[in-house]
């Protein structure tokens, strides 16, 4: 099959898949597929040759490739389908005016920036609802995750970065880097719709003044900056700026979803998967348990909830092939519960280990009055300070927006540090909860690295840190949350070299739990590429007739 023919068929499948999504939204269905968009049915057990848990990057790849192979597949997603307009005529709410759609069953939003000028003006009281963003709390770390069809792609900043080859090879010594960089990274970028900002427009537009100011300060320090690819459609963004398209990135939308412009998974991989006619997505269903029948069938127990969070049904599913794409937290929790409760007792002892935050630390700097960052800021980062090659202190710092509609002279960053600290998850049988052994000392390593870099920038530019952004305690470095949870079922340890879970046949992991705690860049392109590699091998060897 030629590339052009593949692209034409994929386009046709995308159209069919998008139609299925629209039909499900219009009729309020919780099950989405070309032949089966319908409300949930009271069948005792749903069976399919393959089941995918989760519809984030790894799960979406698995769903598309299974569907293309003609294998009937069910995708189980605990969040809702996000394509029905709210009372304001929009699917998602803005960052500055959050409502019930913003957070997963919370009474109040929990944004990464908690205060401004030490005032509690960022977070808002909201109604409880299966919103699009969740913040999962552990003792010394909290993790942001997306909830909905498309997972984290709905709520991230779209930065589609391929890691430095040398660091990828160090993190994945058993993976063929030539194959990854020659085949699977390009395949992932093409399917995700990765593009780059037009440099001339970037230099001239008011919407990226904040990036240019940070670039100037980095250059004065002797540091290198680099443009960062994105899955946000920059053609659409330029039309937003021109007033010929509805504003999304230029309208303050990002962490609670984008109404336009973003190529989230429901518009790419998942639309293509549904378009095959072989894939059905079940929403608002959370898998609680996995076991295996004597004949080798995997048996799943899932709770279906309504929009109040009430469990309205507990269902069982059966499948021959089971793909775990629930993310670092979701997949690890399911496997640990199965191992510790004895339903999958042969799982490897390394399940739960090797977890890290990708070295995430957020911070702000106070600029001089003449270094205005602009009242108008795009919510999509397109540039980073790249000091990763500094062996003594490797850091990649995203130049992040802080769109308030007012000039505030703040330069904001999400630093990705090479933090070698790792923690393990455990399962508490008494409370049926996942526990994380991450400590404040683990986070302190990332803080020290970020501080070392930004102390240099402040010294070169005679600037200081902002102390008013992360709560009432004058905290400079926000080290208690991560956007990039990685690990828990590490490739080559808890699995073989292709994501096959040790101890069980036809059980696979395709998500960020495969990554050993650190990538040095935003991880979703790597997760997608690794999932493509897994699916190519599994479909060639495990499902062949």
Report each predicted region and the residues it spans:
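A glycine-rich dinucleotide-binding beta-alpha-beta segment and adjacent secondary-structure elements
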Residues: 451-518, 524, 528
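N-terminal glycine-rich phosphate/pyrophosphate-binding loop and immediately adjacent elements
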Residues: 41-170, 175, 302, 330, ...
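N-terminal export leaders
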Residues: 10-27
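Conserved beta-strand-loop-beta-strand element in the redox core of flavoprotein oxidoreductases
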Residues: 291-316
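Short hydrophobic core segments
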Residues: 51-53, 317-327
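N-terminal secretory signal peptides
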Residues: 1-14, 36-38
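FAD cofactor-binding and catalytic pocket of flavoenzymes
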Residues: 122-145, 149-156, 170, 174, ...
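Conserved redox-cofactor binding core of oxidoreductases
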Residues: 138, 174-286, 473-482, 490
């Amino acid at each position: 099959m030629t590339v052009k023919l593949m692209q034409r068929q994929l386009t046709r499948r995308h159209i069919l898949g998008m139609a299925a999504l629209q039909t499900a939204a219009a009729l309020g269905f919780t099950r989405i597929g070309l032949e089966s968009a319908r409300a949930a049915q009271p069948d005792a057990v749903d069976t399919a040759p393959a089941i995918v848990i989760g519809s984030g990057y790894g799960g979406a790849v698995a769903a598309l490739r299974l569907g293309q192979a003609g294998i009937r597949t069910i995708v189980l997603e605990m969040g809702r389908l996000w394509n029905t307009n709210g009372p304001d005529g929009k699917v998602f709410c803005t960052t500055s005016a959050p409502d019930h759609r913003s957070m997963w069953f919370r009474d109040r939003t929990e944004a990464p920036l908690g205060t401004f000028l030490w005032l509690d003006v960022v977070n808002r009281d909201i109604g409880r609802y299966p919103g699009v963003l969740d913040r999962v709390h552990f003792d010394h770390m909290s993790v942001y995750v997306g909830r909905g069809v498309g997972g984290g792609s709905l709520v991230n900043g779209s930065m589609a970065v391929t890691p430095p080859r040398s660091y990828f090879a160090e993190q994945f010594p058993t993976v063929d880097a030539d194959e990854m960089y020659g085949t699977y990274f390009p395949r992932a970028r093409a399917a995700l719709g990765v593009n780059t900002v037009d440099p001339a427009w970037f230099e001239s537009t008011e919407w990226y003044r904040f990036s240019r100011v940070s670039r100037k300060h980095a250059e004065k320090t002797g540091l290198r900056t680099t443009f960062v690819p994105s899955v946000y459609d920059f053609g659409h963004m330029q039309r937003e700026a021109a007033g010929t398209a509805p504003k999304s990135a230029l309208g303050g939308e990002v962490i609670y979803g984008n109404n336009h412009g973003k190529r989230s998974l429901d518009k790419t991989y998942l639309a293509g998967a549904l378009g095959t006619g072989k894939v059905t997505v079940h929403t608002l269903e959370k898998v609680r348990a996995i076991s295996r029948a004597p004949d080798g069938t995997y048996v799943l127990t899932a709770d279906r909830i309504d929009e109040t969070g009430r469990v309205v049904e507990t269902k069982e599913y059966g499948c021959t092939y089971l793909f775990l794409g629930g993310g670092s937290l979701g997949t690890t929790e399911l496997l640990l519960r199965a191992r510790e409760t004895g339903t999958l007792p042969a799982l490897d002892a390394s399940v739960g280990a090797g977890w890290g935050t990708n070295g995430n630390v957020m911070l702000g700097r106070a600029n001089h009055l003449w270094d205005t960052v602009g009242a108008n800021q795009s919510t999509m980062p397109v540039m980073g300070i790249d000091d990763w090659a500094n062996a003594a202190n490797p850091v990649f710092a995203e130049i992040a927006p802080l769109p308030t509609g007012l000039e505030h002279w703040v330069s904001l960053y999400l630093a990705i540090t090479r933090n070698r600290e790792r923690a393990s998850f455990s399962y508490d049988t008494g409370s049926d909860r996942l526990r994380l052994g991450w400590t404040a000392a683990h986070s302190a390593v990332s803080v020290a690295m970020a501080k070392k870099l930004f102390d240099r920038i402040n010294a070169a530019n005679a600037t200081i840190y902002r102390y008013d952004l992360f709560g009432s305690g004058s905290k400079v470095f926000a080290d208690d949350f991560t956007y990039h949870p990685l690990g828990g079922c590490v490739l080559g340890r808890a699995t073989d070299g292709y994501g096959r879970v040790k101890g069980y046949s036809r059980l696979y992991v395709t998500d960020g739990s495969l990554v050993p705690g650190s990538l040095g860049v935003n991880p979703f392109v790597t997760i997608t590429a690794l999932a493509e590699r897994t699916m190519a091998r599994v479909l060639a060897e495990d499902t062949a007739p």
